Curated annotation (Swiss-Prot):
GO cellular component term of the entry, any: extracellular space
Species: Cervus elaphus
Gene3D superfamilies: 1.20.1250.10
InterPro entries reported in the protein's UniProt record: 4_helix_cytokine-like_core, IL-2, IL-2_CS
Location(s) in or outside the cell: Secreted
Family: Belongs to the IL-2 family.
Name of the protein: Interleukin-2
Function: Cytokine produced by activated CD4-positive helper T-cells and to a lesser extend activated CD8-positive T-cells and natural killer (NK) cells that plays pivotal roles in the immune response and tolerance. Binds to a receptor complex composed of either the high-affinity trimeric IL-2R (IL2RA/CD25, IL2RB/CD122 and IL2RG/CD132) or the low-affinity dimeric IL-2R (IL2RB and IL2RG). Interaction with the receptor leads to oligomerization and conformation changes in the IL-2R subunits resulting in downstream signaling starting with phosphorylation of JAK1 and JAK3.
SUPFAM superfamilies on file: 4-helical cytokines (SSF47266)
Signal sequence interval, chain numbering: 1-20
Amino acid sequence: MYKIQLLSCIALTLALVANGAPTSSSTGNTMKEVKSLLLDLQLLLEKVKNPENLKLSKMHTFNFFMPKVNATELKHLNCLLEELKLLEDVLSLSPSKNLNPKEIKDSMDEIKDLMDNIKRIVLELQGSETSFKCEYDAATVKAVEFLNKWITFCQRIYSTMT
C-alpha cells in the first residue's frame, strides 16, 4: 500500500523538477545570480558615469527603450538583453582622440567584460525560457536612467526572494 503512495510521490516530484518548478537550491542559485546581476549593473553604471572616460560621452546622448509594462518578472530580462546589444553598438563607436589608445582599450575592455558577464547571468536566469517578446514604451531614457531602472528591477526581484 505504501509502495503506490511512494511511487506516486516520486513521479510527482520528477514531474515538478522536469517542468522547472522551483526547488530550494534553484531559488538559492537564482538569488545569487540576481545579486551578481545587480552588482554588475551597479559597476557598469559607475563606469558609465565616470567623467574621466570621454569615450562614453557619446553614450550619454543615446536613447534606450524600457519595457512598456513595469518589469516585474525574470522573463523581462530579455528586454535588458535586447537593449544591451544596442549599448554595445554605442560603445564600439570611433575612439576619442583625447585619450591614448591603451587607456581607451583598458576602459572598454572592463566595460565589455561587465556586459558579457551581465549577458551570461541573464541567460542563466532565463534558462530555456527566452521566447518572451518585449514591447517597448514609446518614451526613451538615457544610459544612466536605463541602468538605474534595471538596478531597481534587480533590487525588487531580490527583495521578494529574501
